[in-house]
């Protein structure tokens, strides 16, 4: 029986062994790679929406088709929840936006912020009533003690308004995804999203939500109504919530008009003196987007709000607006208020979007000035309407597209 032929050794020595497998990436690098992949999913959805809007121009049609694309929406919801659970929670500002909302609500509803705002309104009204007759009088007005006791009627109105705030704070979280406010005891939370990531969030297209007449019920009956909502939500009564939250919501929409519609619906859903909390991503230093934030402030206040608080984190702007009138007071004839809710990406061309798909495009300061030129006629508003807080800052930050998705 013949022996099996032996394999010939390779020239120059013994047979080479296969190379060892590459070492696995360190945990931190692996986490960052996963975060980049997830943020890429989210940003690609935003880019496609903006691209379609530029190509088609019909934002109703684009949004309707987007809401019917269940596969993309589910992928988006899973990516957002994963980012929030496994990445943002490990950084101070990923959790900070939720904590900021809670802090503002506690300050306003529980620690005297609302009372101070109402008393400030009363002082303004009193000063206005004194100065108006003086404009038409030939003699200077009689000098009285500055800001004496306010009228009993106004004090009673303030007390009644504050008493209505007792109990849980009714909060609507629009674009909730994973219902982050549910864990806070002080809130009766309703989270809505076009594709919820968890069962506790209701399915709802906020842009097309129908607003009905307000409920004429006691507070406990309204609370019971909210606990028995049917899924999906197609309509809600007006003046139902103490707080409406837009956390990273408005920049999702490709059209400024859609952002405007959202703010208008928030005004209709809020009780008088309720809060609209708006958080939008931005990694640039504070003053670089000062013109944009001033534009947003004027547009939102035109609906019947006053800004109560403003903060700048390294990756986002955070604003709280107080509803000061029951009716929307905006004059769309003389001012293009919807167009004032712009974001930097609104000015990108399709080529810019394609470029940003492969690398991070950083706009120059000169380009920023050119984009903001159309809003140069806006009046100066260096302080908050209610809080008097300055918007100045000298902390340097660096800009990324949708930077909040890649917190480091």
Swiss-Prot record:
Q: Where are the residues of the annotated region Disordered? A: 1-37
Q: Where is the composition biased (Basic and acidic residues)?
A: 28-37
Tell me the GO molecular function terms: methyltransferase activity; protein-containing complex binding; S-adenosyl-L-methionine binding
> Is the Metal-binding keyword given for this protein?
no
Return the EC number.
2.1.1.-
Pfam families per record? Bmt2
Which N-terminal stretch is annotated as signal sequence?
A: none
Residues where S-adenosyl-L-methionine binds:
97, 175, 193, 205-206, 247
Keywords assigned by UniProt, alphabetized: Methyltransferase, S-adenosyl-L-methionine, Transferase
One Gene Ontology term from the biological process aspect of the record = positive regulation of TORC1 signaling
Concerning Gene3D superfamilies, the annotation shows:
Vaccinia Virus protein VP39
Q: Which EC class is this protein assigned?
A: transferase
Xref: InterPro entries: Bmt2/SAMTOR (IPR021867), SAM-dependent_MTases_sf (IPR029063)
- Which residues fall in a compositionally biased region of kind Low complexity? 1-16
Instruction: Give start-end positions of Pro residues composition bias.
Output: 17-27
- What is the role of this chain? S-adenosyl-L-methionine-binding protein that acts as an inhibitor of mTORC1 signaling via interaction with the GATOR1 and KICSTOR complexes. Acts as a sensor of S-adenosyl-L-methionine to signal methionine sufficiency to mTORC1: in presence of methionine, binds S-adenosyl-L-methionine, leading to disrupt interaction with the GATOR1 and KICSTOR complexes and promote mTORC1 signaling. Upon methionine starvation, S-adenosyl-L-methionine levels are reduced, thereby promoting the association with GATOR1 and KICSTOR, leading to inhibit mTORC1 signaling.
- Subunit arrangement? Interacts with the GATOR1 complex; interaction is disrupted when SAMTOR binds S-adenosyl-L-methionine. Interacts with the KICSTOR complex; interaction is disrupted when SAMTOR binds S-adenosyl-L-methionine.
Note the HAMAP family from the entry: BMT2
| UniProt record similarity statement | Belongs to the BMT2/SAMTOR family.
| Name of the protein described by the UniProt record | S-adenosylmethionine sensor upstream of mTORC1
Gene source species: Gallus gallus (Chicken)
Lineage of the organism:
Eukaryota, Metazoa, Chordata, Craniata, Vertebrata
């Amino acid at each position: 029986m013949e022996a099996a032929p032996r394999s010939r050794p390779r020239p120059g020595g013994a047979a080479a062994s296969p190379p060892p497998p590459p070492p696995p990436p360190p945990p931190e690098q692996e986490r960052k790679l996963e975060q980049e992949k997830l943020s890429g999913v989210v940003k690609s959805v935003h880019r496609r929406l903006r691209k379609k809007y530029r190509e088609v121009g019909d934002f109703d049609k684009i949004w309707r088709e987007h809401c019917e694309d269940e596969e993309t929406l589910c992928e988006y919801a899973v990516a957002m929840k994963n980012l929030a659970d496994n990445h943002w929670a490990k950084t101070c500002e990923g959790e900070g936006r939720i904590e900021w909302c809670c802090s503002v609500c506690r300050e306003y509803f529980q620690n005297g912020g609302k009372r101070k705002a109402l008393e400030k309104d009363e002082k303004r009204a009193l000063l206005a009533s004194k100065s108006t007759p003086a404009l038409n009088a030939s003699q200077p007005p009689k000098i009285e003690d500055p800001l004496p006791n306010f009228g009993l009627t106004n004090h009673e109105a303030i007390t009644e308004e504050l008493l209505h705030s007792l109990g849980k704070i009714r909060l609507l979280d629009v674009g909730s995804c994973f219902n982050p406010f549910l864990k806070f005891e002080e809130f009766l939370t309703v989270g809505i999203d076009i594709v919820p990531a968890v069962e506790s969030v209701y399915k709802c297209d906020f842009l097309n939500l129908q607003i009905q007449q307000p409920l004429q019920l006691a507070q406990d009956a309204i609370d019971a109504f909210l606990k028995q909502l049917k899924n999906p939500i197609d309509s809600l009564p007006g003046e139902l919530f103490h707080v409406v939250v837009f956390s990273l919501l408005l920049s999702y929409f490709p059209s400024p008009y859609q952002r405007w519609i959202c703010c208008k619906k928030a005004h209709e859903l809020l009780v008088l003196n309720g809060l609209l909390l708006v958080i939008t991503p931005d990694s640039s230093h504070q003053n670089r987007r000062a013109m944009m934030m001033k534009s947003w402030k004027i547009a939102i206040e035109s609906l019947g709000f006053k800004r109560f608080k403003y903060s700048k984190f390294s990756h986002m702007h955070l604003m709280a607006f107080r509803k000061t009138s029951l009716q929307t007071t905006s004059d769309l004839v003389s001012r293009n208020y919807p167009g004032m809710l712009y974001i930097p990406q609104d000015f990108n061309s399709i080529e810019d979007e394609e470029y940003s798909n492969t690398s991070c495009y950083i706009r120059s300061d000169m380009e920023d000035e050119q984009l903001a030129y159309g809003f140069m006629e806006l009046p100066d508003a260096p302080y908050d309407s209610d809080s008097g807080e300055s918007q100045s800052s000298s902390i340097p930050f660096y800009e990324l597209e949708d930077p909040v998705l890649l917190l480091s």
